[in-house]
Amino acid sequence: NHFVTSSEAEVLANDAFNIFINKRHEIEFYDGVANALKSLSMNYSLGVLTNGNADIYRFEIGKYFDFSISSLEAKDSKPNRSHFDKALQKIDGISFVEMLHIGDHQINDIFAANRLGIKTLWFNNKNTEWAQAFEKPKDFSDWNKLPEMIEELYE
């Protein structure tokens, strides 16, 4: 039998979490993401709404975002509305109808935003079939074309 003290267990747990969180931040971004975000950040306030635990500001692209809201901060998970309500608080004078939410999950992103009156774009790089009863939004798979697509759709 192997026994550890509570302080040893805490050290082990912290070490394990640090390994996990460091691995969690070993992400390779899709081609064109950085350029698209740089371009969009010149004209729009950008934010991250995530159910995950990666910190956008640990990445080079973090500099393009004005805010990031995790489930920890929202005290909830998408598709519930807490992330979106908090986003409203981050940008003065904006309403849901003036927002655009870009996401890859049909329920947690598209449905969640759509039901609040937020415009949506679906990142569909796997050419997935639309499986929802509500109308499929415009979709894209090439980040290099995103700024032009947004300009055409919403300007």
PLM features per residue range, with description:
Residues 1-7:
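Helix-loop "lid/cap" segments that line or gate small-molecule binding pockets
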Residues 7-11, 94-97:
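Short helix-terminating capping/connector loops at secondary-structure junctions
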Residues 9-10, 18-48:
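Short, acidic loop-to-helix structural element flanking the phosphoryl-transfer center
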Residues 12-16, 61:
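Hydrophobic side chains within well-formed alpha-helices
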Residues 2, 23, 71-72:
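Alpha-helix C-capping/helix-to-loop hinge sites
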Residues 15-25, 67, 94:
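Conserved acidic, metal-coordinating active-site core of Asp-based
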Residues 34, 38, 44-155:
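Asp-based, Mg2+/Mn2+-dependent phosphohydrolase catalytic module
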